[in-house]
């Protein structure tokens, strides 16, 4: 089955600060920065070679764990196109 990488989605306590760090450390470009309907800040970044990295915060009233099976900080998911 053919597939290609689409994006990575990270969850952060401070999506803006995290995105700024990636800009400084790895020359990412911030494509958009908005608050979604669910109340979470969503920052879309692009690497110098075109990979997309999305960074978002907790949704309204969402309880975030450190690394459990529920919603948690860090890697939320990575997306593949099939």
Residue positions per predicted region:
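General secondary-structure edge motif
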Residues: 1-3, 59
């Amino acid at each position: 089955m053919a597939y290609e990488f689409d994006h990575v989605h990270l969850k952060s306590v401070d999506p803006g600060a995290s995105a700024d760090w990636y800009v400084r450390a790895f020359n990412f470009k911030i494509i958009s920065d908005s608050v979604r309907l669910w109340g979470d800040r969503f920052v879309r970044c692009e690497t110098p070679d075109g990979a997309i990295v999305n960074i978002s915060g907790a949704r309204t009233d969402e309880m975030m764990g450190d690394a459990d099976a529920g919603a948690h900080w860090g890697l939320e998911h990575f997306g593949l196109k099939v």
